[in-house]
A protein has these predicted regions:
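FAD-site-proximal beta/loop scaffold in flavoenzymes
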Residues: 3-8, 14-41, 135-200, 210-211
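FAD-binding beta-loop-beta segment adjacent to the flavin cofactor pocket
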Residues: 163-181, 232-253
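Rossmann-like NAD(P)H-binding beta-loop-alpha module
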Residues: 26-80
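Extended hydrophobic secondary-structure segments that form protein cores and membrane-embedded regions
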Residues: 47-48, 81-89, 225-232
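Residues forming the flavin
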Residues: 46-48, 55-56, 63-66, 70-71, ...
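A Rossmann-like FAD-binding core segment of flavoenzymes
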Residues: 72-164, 217-219
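A conserved FAD-binding loop/helix module that cradles the flavin
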Residues: 183-232, 238-241
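C-terminal auxiliary extensions adjacent to catalytic cores
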Residues: 239-305
Length: 305
C-alpha cells in the first residue's frame, strides 16, 4: 500500500534519529519514543507533518492529544510545550473539521503551526526549517515521515512519481490498464489512506470487475466514503464521516438524531466506539460479515454548517 520514507527528508535520520527524533509508524520508532518519554523531564515536543498523503490522517492529532493527557497524568503538563506543525492551513484538510479540531487542540494548550512546508531538520540546533526559512525549535521531534507507494509499484511501471497507481476515483479501475483495479492505499484516489476507505471501496469492486470482464459499462461508483474515530485522551474521542463531495460535518452516527456516536464531538461514547471497533475488526470485518453501515456515505444525521 503505502510506506514511510524518512530518507526523503533531509537530516531526519541524522545523529538524533531515535534519540530525540522519532516516528511512531514502526515498532522500533514507537519503542524508542516510549523509552525517551519515560525519563524525559520536559521541554518542547513537536509533532510534524512534512508531506501529504500519509497513513491515517488523524493519527498525528491523536498523538498530540494522547501525549497531552500522558504528561498531565504524570503531573508534568506544565513542563511540556506541545506544537502541531503541519503543511496544511489548519489542524485538518477540510475547513469545518479543521476549525473544530483546531479549537480542541487550543483547549488543550497545543499550538498549531500551519502552512509549514518542511525543508530539512537541523540536528545541531534542534530545529525544523521550512522552505521559506521559518524555524520551529524542539527538544523531542515526532514526525510523520514522507509516505510513498511500494517499490514494487515503481518497478512495475504502474505508479506515478509517488509510486501510487493512477486510479479512476469512482470505478477504481487503473487509468493506464483496463484489466487492473485498485483499492486501498496503493491508489492515488483523493481520499484518506485508511482502512475504512479500503473496506467501503471493496464493497463496490466486484460489480465493476464483472462488468469489465463482460464488456459492460461499470455500474458501481465509489463516493470516497471514509470514517474514523479520533482518540483525544481522558477517555474521550471524536468521529468523522465524509466522502469526496461532503466534508466532515457535525451530527450523529449511524442513526440520525440518536447516534449513539457524535460526529465532530468530543465524547466518552466515541471513545467506547473505538474500543468496540477492535472487536468488530477481528470478529466481523476479517470474517467478511456485513456491517450495518453502507458503502455510500449518507447525509442522514449530519448538520450542514
Amino acid at each position: 500500500g503505502t510506506e514511510t520514507r524518512p530518507s526523503e527528508t533531509e537530516g531526519l535520520q541524522d545523529k538524533l534519529w531515535y534519540k530525540d527524533i522519532f516516528d511512531f509508524y514502526t515498532v522500533e520508532g514507537a519503542v524508542a519514543l516510549h523509552k525517551r518519554f519515560k525519563d524525559w523531564e520536559g521541554g518542547k515536543l513537536v509533532m510534524a507533518i512534512p508531506e501529504l498523503p500519509y497513513k491515517c490522517p488523524v493519527a498525528p492529532i491523536e498523538f498530540v492529544c494522547l501525549a497531552e493527557a500522558y504528561f498531565a497524568e504524570r503531573g508534568m503538563r506544565d513542563k511540556v510545550e506541545i506544537s502541531y506543525v503541519t503543511l496544511m492551513s489548519g489542524a485538518f484538510t477540510k475547513p469545518v473539521a479543521s476549525k473544530v479540531l483546531g479549537d480542541l487542540l487550543e483547549e488543550k494548550n497545543i499550538e498549531v503551526v500551519s502552512d509549514f512546508y518542511m525543508s530539512h531538520v537541523d540536528n545541531e540546533n534542534k530545529k525544523i526549517v521550512s522552505y521559506d526559512e521559518r524555524e520551529v525549535d524542539f527538544d523531542i521531534l515526532t514526525i510523520v515521515p514522507v509516505n510513498m507507494g511500494s517499490d514494487m509499484i515503481e518497478r512495475s511501471g504502474l505508479g506515478d512519481d509517488m509510486n501510487y497507481v493512477p486510479t479512476d476515483k469512482h470505478t477504481l479501475q487503473s487509468k493506464q490498464f483496463e484489466n487492473i483495479f485498485v483499492i486501498g492505499d496503493a491508489s492515488n484516489i483523493p481520499t484518506s489512506k485508511a482502512g475504512s476507505v479500503a473496506h467501503f471501496a471493496a464493497e463496490i469492486l466486484t460489480e465493476n470487475i464483472l462488468a469489465a470482464m463482460e464488456g459492460r459499462e461499470m455500474p458501481a461508483k465509489f463516493d470516497g466514503h471514509a470514517n474514523c474515530y479520533i482518540e483525544t485522551g481522558y477517555g474521550k474521542g471524536a468521529l468523522i464521516d465524509f466522502n469526496y463531495e461532503t466534508e466532515p460535518l457535525p451530527g450523529t452516527f449511524p442513526l440520525p438524531g440518536i447516534g449513539p456516536f457524535g460526529l465532530l464531538k468530543n465524547t466518552k461514547m466515541n471513545h467506547y466506539g473505538k474500543i468496540l471497533f477492535r472487536w468488530i475488526y477481528w470478529h466481523i470485518l476479517l470474517k467478511g460479515r456485513e456491517l450495518p453501515v453502507e458503502a455510500d456515505m449518507t447525509m442522514a444525521g449530519k448538520i450542514r454548517v
